[in-house]
């Protein structure tokens, strides 16, 4: 029996294609050497925070596209995003615009999940708007890549430094002793673990660790408490330390905000999550943690980074968000009137459910059903939980 040729004999790059059979060769030729590459946004956010997640995905896209070009095939990316900003969500045209040059190649796949499907494509008007934004964004990216190529350079070394600072600060938070206890009390993650929503269970094996928790309920639970740390934590302290220790690097980032879509998109998205936080509601959920020392420790860390983030983004963008984004604030102001009432009902129901003994099965199940209905209502009001 004749053996199939080795990867080198078949013309495939060594190592990157460890074993290639004849059928695979024929299939690759039929696809004109186009390679689909999937990128994950959710677990990278949970593991390293939003800044490190976005920056490392950006680098991966750029480097993988270069590898494809070097070896004579075309890459296109499948973005495994979610509805929340923390998991890669956002305006489609801005999302595409923020990608590195020569990485879209007129082709892009993207996931749409949960309630985001109805929000984005639930009626002809919104569906038309979002599909037009996506296709026009791809067209614009392709045109700009061909016109400018690699002519424009950005301070990527500074961005890598900022990303590392944000990553370290984020990891310090989630590795701080007592964090799991605070998280378990200050969010309704225990309710989400009992729910039947989603295609997979909230935890991979059932152990009570952060590593075992899936990224979707991680983001969902924080956002329901309006403690939106998954969308900004780490950036505030990272920017402040960069400004104090390397002011010239801080200024170099500021100078390219309007010309570097990736950086501007990151800052605007982060700012949106800051706007969607609510200090009063945040404190009410934090009060569910009955250990005052533990509660105060984590709320002080969270508030400190929140304040740094607001101040640093204001410096970078020259004006406070309230003067630049009046529409967003007006929108949240209208929704908050109803949301504050829903959050209070949710808090009362959550306390009642937690205090009900497990032996009272019917009573506990009835309260759980009520809780899930309230969560659905809050989710619809926040519009940042998918």
Annotate each predicted stretch with a short phrase.
Residues 32-33, 93-111:
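Flexible glycine/proline-rich, aromatic-decorated loop/lid segments
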């Amino acid at each position: 029996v004749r053996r199939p040729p080795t990867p080198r004999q078949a013309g495939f790059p060594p190592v990157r294609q460890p074993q290639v059979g004849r059928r695979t060769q024929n299939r690759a030729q039929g696809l004109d050497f186009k390679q689909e590459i999937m990128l994950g946004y959710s677990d990278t956010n949970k593991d390293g925070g939003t800044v490190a997640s976005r920056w490392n995905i950006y680098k991966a896209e750029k480097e993988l596209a270069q590898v494809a070009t070097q070896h004579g095939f075309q890459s296109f990316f499948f973005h495994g995003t979610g509805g929340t900003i923390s998991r890669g969500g956002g305006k489609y045209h801005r999302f595409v615009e923020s990608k590195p040059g020569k990485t879209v190649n007129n082709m892009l796949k993207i996931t749409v999940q949960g309630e985001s499907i109805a929000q984005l494509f639930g009626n002809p008007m919104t569906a038309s708007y979002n599909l037009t934004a996506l296709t026009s964004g791809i067209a614009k990216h392709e045109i700009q890549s061909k016109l400018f190529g690699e002519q424009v350079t950005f301070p990527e070394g500074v961005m890598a430094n900022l990303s590392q600072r944000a990553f370290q600060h984020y990891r310090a938070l989630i590795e701080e002793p007592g964090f799991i206890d605070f998280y378990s009390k200050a969010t309704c993650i225990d309710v989400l673990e009992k729910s039947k929503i989603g295609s997979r269970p909230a935890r991979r094996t059932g152990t009570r660790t952060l590593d075992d928790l899936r990224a979707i309920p991680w983001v969902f639970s924080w956002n329901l408490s309006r403690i939106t740390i998954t969308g900004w934590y780490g950036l505030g302290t990272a920017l402040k330390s960069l400004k104090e220790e390397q002011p010239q690097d801080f200024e170099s980032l500021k100078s390219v905000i309007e010309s570097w879509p990736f950086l501007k998109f990151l800052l605007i998205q982060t700012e949106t999550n800051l706007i969607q936080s609510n200090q009063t509601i945040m404190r009410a959920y934090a009060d569910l943690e009955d250990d005052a020392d533990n509660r105060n420790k984590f709320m002080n860390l969270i508030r400190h980074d929140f304040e740094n983030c607001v101040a640093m983004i204001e410096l970078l963008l020259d004006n406070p968000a309230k003067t630049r984004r009046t529409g967003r604030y007006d929108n949240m102001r209208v929704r908050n009137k109803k949301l504050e009432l829903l959050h209070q009902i949710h808090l009362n129901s959550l306390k009642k459910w937690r205090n009900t003994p497990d032996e009272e099965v019917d009573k506990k199940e009835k309260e759980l059903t009520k809780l899930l209905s309230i969560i659905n209502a809050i989710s619809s009001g926040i519009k940042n939980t998918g």
